[in-house]
Regions:
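Membrane-interface helix-loop junctions and terminal tails of multi-pass membrane proteins
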Residues: 1-113
Length: 113
């Protein structure tokens, strides 16, 4: 559960930093895409290196898609523990938004003054 939250937080935070004009690390779209993709690969690698492979998508929208795909296949028994992906992915994403808005952007604005 902790891995889902941390993974979602890291992915969301880096995505926010690379999609906002003032906080981008590079203006080149290829480098921006590389940063976001490398973040996702690193998070998945981190999740698998913990010894517990959860199969978490680390993305709340992907977790929702996974839930609906399983549900439409009429396999409701496999959705018993899907709440872990929903709740902790969303908590991690909300934590990343708070960190980005309340800490990172203010620190970036102070450093640019």
């Amino acid at each position: 559960m902790f891995l889902e939250m941390i993974g979602a937080m890291i992915i969301t935070f880096l995505n926010l930093t690379q999609t906002e004009k003032d906080t981008k690390m590079s203006e080149d779209p290829a480098i921006t895409t590389l940063i976001i993709a490398a973040t996702y690969v690193a998070v998945v690698g981190y999740g698998e290196s913990s010894g517990v492979v959860t199969g978490s998508p680390y993305n709340p929208a992907a977790a929702m898609g996974l839930f609906w795909a399983i549900l439409f296949q009429s396999n409701i028994d496999r959705t018993e523990h899907i709440w872990v992906f929903f709740i902790f992915s969303y908590l991690g994403s909300m934590l990343a938004v708070l960190l980005f808005e309340c800490v990172y952007k203010k620190a970036m604005n102070m450093s640019h003054r």
